[in-house]
Amino acid sequence: MLDATREALAELGWGGLTMGHVASRAGVAKTTLYRRWPSKNELVVDAVASIFDELVMPDLGSLRADIEAVVGQFADLLARPETQAALLALFAEGTRDPQLRRRIREAIVDPQKRLVRQGRAAAQARGELEADTDTASACEEVDIIFDTIAGTVEHRVLVSGEPITPAWTRRFIDLLLGPLIVG
């Protein structure tokens, strides 16, 4: 059902997407959809959130290698036409609907911050980053790092239409890590 939702969204756009279209494409009754998702917004958010489940933070032995791997995974994900259509539609609709924006944050953004937390913890354990001194600052830094990486990659792919090349990734990581790396 989630695949059918993303396919229908890519084909029809937000305005054209209905629970009926998704049910027909998925081969289920509309009541089946409504039992699990009370609205189109909920269904689309879950469909988009499931795309990001495949992102993982590897432990490749260095923060640089870990970030390169995640940026590559994220760029590959964003290169898919269905992902582009789904994200752009969801973000556009979220600008008009504060509840949808909150749901996007809860179901998509906040769960993906786990990648930053995992990468930071591994880098701290390896001595690449200083240990956190207080929880509030650490949480704020996770937010800033996530926003910087996700925002930059999304903007480059979805807004500028530019590819994420290995050379671009290396330069981006140089700029990102320069002030962070311990001594």
Model-assigned labels for residue ranges:
Residues 38-42, 78-79, 95-99, 163:
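Residues in soluble alpha-helical coiled-coils and helical-bundle/repeat scaffolds
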Residues 47-48, 79-105:
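Amphipathic alpha-helical segments used for helix-helix packing
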Residues 42, 65, 69, 85-89, ...:
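Amphipathic alpha-helical interaction segments
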Residues 4-42, 46:
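Helix-turn-helix
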Residues 40, 47, 82, 108-112, ...:
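Hydrophobic/aromatic residues within well-ordered alpha-helical segments
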Residues 4-12, 66, 70-73, 86-93, ...:
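Solvent-exposed, amphipathic alpha-helical segments
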Residues 55-84, 138:
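Hydrophobic alpha-helical connector segments
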Residues 102, 106, 110, 124-175, ...:
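Hydrophobic/aromatic-rich alpha-helical bundle segments in the mid-to-C-terminal region
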